[in-house]
């Protein structure tokens, strides 16, 4: 890696770490951690399938599109994680403790955030009245991943950006 790129990366990592530590410390209250843990768990695959299942029944076209979106996102972010191999903050730093078990080894990008934003964009385009709830949930989930010690802010920002793009693309095929 060229020296100028390495220097920029090092500055970015330092900023990421400062923000991750600040958010992690700010939420050092057991009740808040428990609430954010519940929010984070709501972004797990079984919950997404529990949402997509009824969609397949209510509106098969939207349900199938949501399934395809989820599959496409997996195909995007798994190789990125394998390529970047970024350690999770709770693994790399002793002062950041994981308040939940990470779903995989690497942190970049945040798959939970990617899926939450992608589905929020898609479902908001389908049912605009749900947009505040869906976008609010996606933002809360993204914050929870940093607070709980399993992601850096840049992980969730990258996940959100990818999810926004894939969700917007998928929304073009809504009936």
Describe every region a protein language model picked out:
Residues 1-47, 77-103:
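N-terminal transmembrane-helix/juxtamembrane module of multi-pass inner/ER membrane proteins
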Residues 29-32, 46, 60-63, 89-90, ...:
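Membrane-helix interface segments
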Residues 35-38, 53-54, 67, 135-139, ...:
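Residue-level signature of the transmembrane alpha-helical core
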Residues 43-52, 112-120:
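Core segments of transmembrane alpha-helices
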Residues 51-76:
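Interfacial segments of alpha-helical transmembrane regions
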Residues 56, 80-85, 124, 171-175:
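Membrane-water interface at transmembrane helix exits
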Residues 68-73, 77, 159, 163, ...:
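Alpha-helical transmembrane segments in multi-pass membrane proteins
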Residues 93-175:
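Membrane-embedded catalytic cores of phosphoryl/pyrophosphoryl-handling enzymes
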